[in-house]
């Protein structure tokens, strides 16, 4: 469980913003394909570096995973605020934010026929392509974990790395690859937040606690990617339900924003009471592997 996910999302978001900012400032004529591609590649690069840092510290140096993750989050937030503040100064804006309208419009394009399908198109087909990419990733990862040899090997590494190592599985390689790919996916989450949810506006500390919400979602989904689709819809609904309740004070709104975390705590209590193995996290979750202790 990478507690640095919030920081990785931050870095993925700001590096995507930097790529988009450079392109918007230098392009004489905006190309839709490049407008989307450059921020994505920038986000991949930034989040991949974060994944490599976490992998090196926790897999190679065997540092404490929880402490390393928290440090990575602190670093990621500071990195984002520093470079975000630098971009804000470059724009000479009167407000403390950077707005990338052209890039946001390219990312937010929905299917052209969605509006013609009534309520169905409005509910299911009116989102940007990254939303559907996220769903596809969850389905593919679920299939990979349960139906492929390498996916089963990865699960074995998470359950008992010593046994996996004895069976000839390269534990370090599997951990490095999975951490880096997971970081890239988290970076996409940060990019999606900025370009779609925030309409291309970057302001420091804008992510709030959404990175931690992603970590809570992993626990809620009981480490099953397919359940994370349902969980993300539920968490998203709980997080914004206060917008549809009239006459709520600011303090009451913050209480409603707590509900996803309360639900996660309830899920943890329930699965601990059930004591069924299929509902439990991987046995080696958060533990460093020392081959000489095998």
Question: Which role does the model predict for each range below?
Answer:
Residues 18, 22, 49-52, 56-61, ...:
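Membrane-interface helix caps of multi-pass small-molecule transporters
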Residues 186, 196-261:
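Transmembrane alpha-helical segments in multi-pass inner-membrane proteins
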Residues 67, 93-98, 128-132, 206-210, ...:
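Loop-to-transmembrane alpha-helix initiation sites
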Residues 122-201, 225, 229-230:
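Helix-loop-helix "hairpin" substructures at the membrane interface of multi-pass membrane proteins
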Residues 29-77, 239:
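Alpha-helical transmembrane segments within multi-pass membrane transporters and channels
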Residues 159-162, 166, 171-173, 245-294:
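Cytosolic-side transmembrane-helix boundaries in multi-pass membrane proteins
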């Amino acid at each position: 469980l990478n507690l640095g996910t919030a920081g990785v999302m931050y870095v993925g978001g700001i590096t995507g913003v930097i790529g988009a900012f450079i392109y918007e400032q230098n392009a004489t004529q905006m190309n839709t394909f490049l407008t989307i591609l450059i921020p994505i590649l920038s986000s991949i690069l930034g989040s991949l570096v974060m994944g490599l840092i976490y992998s090196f510290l926790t897999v190679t140096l065997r540092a404490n995973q929880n402490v390393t993750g928290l440090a990575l989050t602190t670093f990621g937030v500071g990195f984002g605020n520093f470079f975000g503040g630098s971009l804000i100064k470059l724009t000479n804006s009167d407000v403390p934010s950077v707005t990338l309208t052209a890039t946001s419009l390219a990312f937010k394009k929905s299917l052209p026929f969605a509006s013609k399908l009534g309520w169905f198109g409005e509910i299911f087909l009116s989102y940007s392509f990254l939303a559907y990419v996220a769903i596809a990733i969850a389905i593919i990862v679920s299939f990979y974990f349960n139906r492929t040899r390498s996916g089963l090997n990865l699960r074995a590494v998470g359950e008992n790395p010593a046994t996996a190592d004895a069976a000839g599985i390269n534990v370090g390689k599997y951990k490095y690859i999975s951490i880096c790919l997971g970081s890239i996916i988290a970076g996409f989450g940060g990019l999606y937040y900025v370009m779609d949810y925030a309409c291309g506006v970057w302001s420091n500390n804008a992510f709030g606690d959404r990175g931690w919400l992603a970590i809570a979602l992993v626990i809620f989904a009981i480490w099953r990617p397919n359940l994370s689709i349902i969980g993300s819809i539920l968490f998203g609904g709980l997080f914004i339900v206060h917008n549809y309740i009239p006459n709520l004070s600011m303090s009451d709104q913050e209480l409603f924003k707590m509900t996803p975390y309360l639900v996660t705590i309830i899920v943890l209590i329930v699965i601990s009471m059930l004591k069924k193995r299929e509902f439990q996290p991987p046995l080696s979750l958060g533990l460093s592997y020392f081959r000489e202790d095998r």
